[in-house]
Amino acid sequence: MPIFKSQSNSIVQWIILTWVFLLSHAAVADQIKAIPWIKLKTESSQAKQICQALKVNCGKDVEVWKKQSGADTHLYLTDDTPQLIEFIKENNQYVVLNSWSFQQYQHHGRNSDFDKELNNDGLSIYPAFYPLNHQKLAIAVVKRWSTTYSGGGRAEEIADFVMLEPNHAYKLALADVAFHSYEMIRACFSQEEYQSSPHCHDESGSNLSIQFKDIGKEYYQWRLNFTDFNWEAFKPESSKVVEKSYNIVVPFQQK
């Protein structure tokens, strides 16, 4: 009996250790997330001074960012051209570490319906890093179309996810991904309707979120989660219809 009891305890300990190991790895896997940027408060004059100190030609809408988490001291500058400049402040001087220009970038978000119905608003860089593996990161280069209605409007955004590489280089990782859309159409036209209706617009839209999983290959698996909603006019918010779908992809393996 003592021998059996000892073996039983060993088995129980082994099972517990195995579960701890699996759960710890699952927790690590769950920690693979996109890295949002935080916008730093900079006046336009300060942004201009930073551009001059970095000796770079900046366009309009200059913004300075840092990563939301971690002790990383790297800073990031974006503008409307668009371009991304990675730099640090060292001994009260700004030093460029790398830069990527997307001024001549040929975006893969080509939708003939958008081009016919909406205005092309050009490209922008979304303020976040998207992990490709333990070392490589991508950014979303977003193409936007929009238009305005009387009392509403519509916007469509498509993203190319681009891997950043040294020496100003980049490589397309994932193309033509629905990133964000929104449409609002006015449905109330009288004072009585505005006063009595719980909702005076037809609204619909879609948003993308991404989950990352290490599958033991060169690049993480990306689960593209799409959340679509439709909220009809004259109905309370509780009647809003939300639908979810997803697509599983691996960067650089797009067909």
What do these predicted regions represent?
Residues 71-77, 132-145, 217-226:
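Acidic/hydrophobic-patterned starts of short beta strands in beta-sheet-rich repeat architectures
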Residues 34-90:
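Basic/polar, acidic-poor N-terminal "presequence/leader" segments
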Residues 29-58, 152-255:
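Acidic, small-residue rich beta-repeat scaffolds with periodic aromatic anchors
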Residues 75-135:
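Short N-terminal edge-element motif at the start of the domain
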Residues 24-25:
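N-terminal signal peptide c-region/cleavage motif recognized by signal peptidases
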Residues 74-77, 114-116, 148-154, 236-241:
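Short consensus segments that form the blades of beta-propeller domains
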Residues 61-70, 119-134, 209-217:
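Structural signature of eukaryotic scaffold interfaces centered on beta-propeller domains
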Residues 2-15:
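Bacterial N-terminal signal peptides that target proteins for export
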